[in-house]
Regions:
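Catalytic phosphate/metal-binding cores of nucleic-acid and nucleotide-processing enzymes, i.e., regions
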Residues: 2-135
Length: 135
């Protein structure tokens, strides 16, 4: 199941374990770029790449073996340190996160696309920060 962060017209935030949210509210959720993987964008949703093609929000720390849970946790933790340091100084990652937050506030339905989900993914950190900003 996917966690969707929704912004109501009053800019309140709710989280739900639904795969798709109905109505005109904006939201952001994680999706997977692999062919046949779950979480592909549905009609009315906008895909935003957050893999390494995105030089700002992509995780620059390479996971050499996607089945190595320890290595996955390590690259996510390294991204966490870099991400929170960037947020603290209003760097480019903070600006990109705020831009996504504003898009959700205006009602856009965004699917943050990476190769990891539903396995642990750095995208969860980005979504959690957007959720915090919407509260």
């Amino acid at each position: 199941m996917t966690t969707i962060i929704r912004a109501t017209t009053a800019h309140q935030t709710t989280a739900t374990a639904a795969a798709f949210a109905c109505g005109s509210e904006g939201y952001i959720r994680l999706g997977n770029k692999r062919a046949g993987a779950p979480g592909k964008p549905k009609p009315g949703e906008t895909a935003v790449d957050i893999d390494r093609k995105n030089r700002i929000l992509g995780n620059p720390f390479i996971l050499h073996d996607p089945n190595d849970k320890t290595a996955r946790a390590d690259v996510i933790e390294r991204f966490r340190a870099k991400y929170y340091a960037d947020l603290a100084c209003d760097g480019p990652m903070a600006a990109a996160t705020q831009a996504l937050t504003e898009r959700v506030k205006t009602g856009e339905r965004i699917v943050a696309m990476c190769w990891c989900w539903p396995k642990p993914c750095h995208g969860t950190l980005i979504i959690d920060e957007i959720k915090r900003r919407l509260e």
